[in-house]
């Protein structure tokens, strides 16, 4: 019993640290977010309308219902408790309500990420560093401080990979019908459990089929609320086709423009280099302690596919955090290892090169 209490206390303390760090990096983004000039976050106006019960918007955003719905509940709780002048300082009740919901979701993402990294055998300090890298990303800060729905999307990703790693089919099966409603881009990640041998694929398959039934039922219901006859149909397939048509243009904009490079760099900044070093270490067998599960590698084509479908490369690339951050930690751990000089990174690299040149 004492061990269980110790684990609860430890996780609680870790979550408090995560809450504090997340507040520190995201609050200024929330406080100074300009609703009149969203600068690339134009979907925020749709979510604001939805949180106020207006789903008659001519946009594919209207089906991402969970965060706007929760925001409306938080608004009803906050409004009578906080004086209007204080709410005005927070940017108004709408902004404050969105921030509470998104702040909680990204903090929970950080907690699940910590547990995920611990399962991969990273020690508590490295695991917490991985959480800080995620929460400190410019894209995560935007997802927390701005009125958008990506926070639940990132939480859904880490929930899926965590329960795949722990081989918890039952929990995955229960949560999948909810996770599928977070954002349409979560759908490819819902197929990751099929690449884990220990997952009960029949049980999860039933859950996934049920999830798609729920997915299309919710979308059909929301479509029926629109007074515009043109908007009564679910545009999901048209949206995918239109994105595919602009795929080549998106590739040029993402990988061959200053704006695209900025979007790539802003996701993990200098930690991209550490991640590449971690990949190299694993490829050269210099890292044999940390083993990255094979199913995580399927995240790479999923994420790359998103950069083809969307010009917002930063928000798409952050989806790769469950595989980028572990490799980043492998690289950082190797560089800052406190082992003896005989096992120092540079010495090992020189030894390997000498061996290859023989």
What would you call each of these model-derived segments?
Residues 158-163, 170-183, 188-195, 212:
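Membrane-interface alpha helices of multi-pass inner-membrane proteins
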Residues 6-41, 209-223, 299-303:
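Transmembrane signal-anchor helices characteristic of membrane glycosylation enzymes that use polyprenol
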Residues 127-136, 176-180:
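Short helix- or helix-capping micro-motifs
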Residues 92, 96-120:
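Transmembrane-helix motifs of polytopic, lipid-linked glycan transferases
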Residues 110-111, 265-291, 298-302, 327:
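Hydrophobic, aromatic-rich transmembrane alpha-helices
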Residues 112-115, 133, 151-172, 323-327:
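Specific aromatic-rich, kink-prone transmembrane helix
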Residues 59, 63, 97-104, 133, ...:
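Membrane-embedded glycan-lipid processing machinery
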Residues 57-92:
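Short hydrophobic/aromatic helix or loop-helix immediately within or flanking a transmembrane segment
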């Amino acid at each position: 019993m004492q061990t269980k209490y110790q684990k609860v206390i430890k996780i609680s303390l870790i979550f408090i640290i995560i809450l504090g760090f997340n507040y520190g990096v995201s609050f200024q983004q929330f406080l100074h977010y300009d609703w009149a000039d969203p600068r690339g976050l134009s979907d925020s106006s749709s979510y604001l309308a939805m949180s106020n019960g207006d789903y008659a918007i001519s946009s594919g955003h209207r089906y991402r219902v969970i965060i706007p719905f929760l925001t409306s509940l938080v608004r009803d709780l906050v409004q009578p408790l906080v004086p209007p002048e204080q709410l005005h300082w927070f940017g108004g009740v709408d902004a404050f309500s969105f921030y509470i919901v998104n702040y909680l979701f990204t903090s929970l993402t950080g907690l699940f990420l910590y547990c995920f990294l611990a399962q991969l055998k990273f020690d508590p300090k490295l695991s917490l560093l991985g959480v800080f890298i995620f929460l400190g990303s410019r894209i995560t800060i935007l997802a927390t401080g701005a009125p958008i729905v990506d926070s639940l999307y990132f939480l859904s990703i880490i929930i899926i990979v965590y329960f795949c790693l722990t081989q918890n089919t039952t929990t995955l099966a229960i949560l999948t019908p909810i996770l599928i409603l977070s954002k349409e881009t979560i759908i490819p990640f819902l197929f990751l459990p099929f690449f884990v041998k220990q997952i009960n694929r029949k049980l999860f398959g039933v859950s996934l089929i049920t999830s798609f039934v729920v997915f299309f039922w919710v979308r059909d219901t929301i479509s029926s609320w629109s007074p515009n006859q043109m908007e009564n149909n679910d545009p999901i397939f048209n949206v995918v086709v239109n994105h595919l048509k602009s795929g080549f243009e998106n590739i040029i904009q993402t990988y061959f423009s200053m704006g695209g490079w900025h979007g790539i760099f802003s996701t993990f900044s200098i930690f991209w280099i550490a991640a590449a070093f971690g990949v190299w270490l694993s490829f050269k067998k210099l890292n044999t302690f940390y083993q990255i599960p094979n199913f995580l590698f399927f995240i790479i084509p999923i994420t790359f596919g998103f950069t083809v479908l969307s010009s917002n490369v930063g928000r798409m690339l952050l989806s790769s955090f469950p595989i980028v951050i572990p490799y980043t930690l492998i690289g950082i751990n190797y560089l800052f290892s406190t082992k003896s000089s005989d096992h120092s990174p540079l010495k090992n690299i020189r030894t390997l090169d000498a061996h290859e040149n023989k």
